[in-house]
């Protein structure tokens, strides 16, 4: 045994190396316009990189460089690429929701209106498969550390579907139905991304799921 190994084995246990903890800024804590703009730049950079190279291309240093922020600053806003991509997914759903004119949602019945919204989301997510794959992959495999971001995404999807069904304020039952439809929608989105189902297959499956859950009623 070498002297180096002997010294190591006879020495008292060394204290564990200190790990630097970065205080992460929650979105609600972004008090200044500069902070909000920086967060927007970071998410824009993330989506631009994912659009070209998918999930694997999204590396923290690459995002920091494109967003023109220090890597340490990036980690203060988003502690991992999963947080980045799930937050980007949430922002995309928020944009779709904000652009949707509720008075223009086609259909006189809950079935028709919900089908309209499901189709709208399908078309939006199928425009850029690499970006969608990156955001969806992060969402599916997110752990408890990204629970807040995942919860926000789930609430956004559920709310969009529930409000599409409702003629006014959604009921508790409509929110429950929306949650089931959200799960079915995500499952079929993954099937499309992995080429296990065509866009037509996905549309037919979701139409059937909506029909089975709420029926094709004649009344609103």
Swiss-Prot record:
GO terms for molecular function: DNA binding; DNA-binding transcription factor activity; protein homodimerization activity; transcription cis-regulatory region binding. Residues 36-96 form the HTH tetR-type domain. PROSITE patterns: HTH_TETR_2. Pfam families: TetR_C_20, TetR_N. The keyword Thylakoid does not apply. One of its GO terms (biological process) is regulation of DNA-templated transcription. Gene3D superfamilies: Tetracycline Repressor, domain 2. Residues 59-78 bind DNA. The keyword Repressor applies. SUPFAM superfamilies: Homeodomain-like. InterPro entries: Homeodomain-like_sf, HTH-type_TetR-like_transc_reg, HTH_TetR, KstR_C. Keywords: DNA-binding, Repressor, Transcription, Transcription regulation. Controls the expression of genes used for utilizing diverse lipids as energy sources. PANTHER family: HTH-TYPE TRANSCRIPTIONAL REGULATOR RUTR, HTH-TYPE TRANSCRIPTIONAL REPRESSOR KSTR. Homodimer. This is HTH-type transcriptional repressor KstR.
């Amino acid at each position: 045994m070498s002297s180096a190994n002997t010294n190591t084995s006879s020495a008292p246990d060394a204290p564990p190396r200190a790990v630097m903890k970065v205080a992460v800024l929650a979105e609600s804590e972004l008090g200044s316009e500069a902070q909000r703009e920086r967060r927007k730049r970071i998410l824009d950079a993330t989506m631009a990189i994912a659009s070209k190279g998918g999930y694997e291309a999204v590396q923290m240093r690459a995002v920091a460089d494109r967003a023109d922020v220090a890597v340490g600053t990036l980690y203060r806003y988003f502690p991992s690429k999963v947080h980045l991509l799930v937050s980007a997914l949430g922002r995309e759903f928020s944009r779709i929701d904000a652009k949707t004119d509720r008075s223009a949602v086609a259909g006189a019945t809950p079935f028709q209106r919900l089908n309209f919204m499901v189709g709208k989301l399908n078309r939006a997510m199928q425009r850029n498969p690499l970006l969608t794959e990156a955001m969806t992959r992060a969402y599916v495999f997110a752990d408890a550390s990204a629970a807040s971001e995942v919860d926000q995404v789930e609430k956004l999807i559920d709310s969009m579907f529930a409000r599409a069904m409702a003629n006014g304020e959604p009921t508790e039952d409509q929110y429950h139905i929306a949650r089931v439809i959200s799960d079915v929608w995500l499952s079929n989105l993954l099937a499309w991304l992995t080429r296990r189902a065509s866009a037509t297959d996905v549309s037919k499956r979701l139409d059937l799921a909506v029909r089975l859950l709420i029926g094709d009623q004649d009344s609103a």
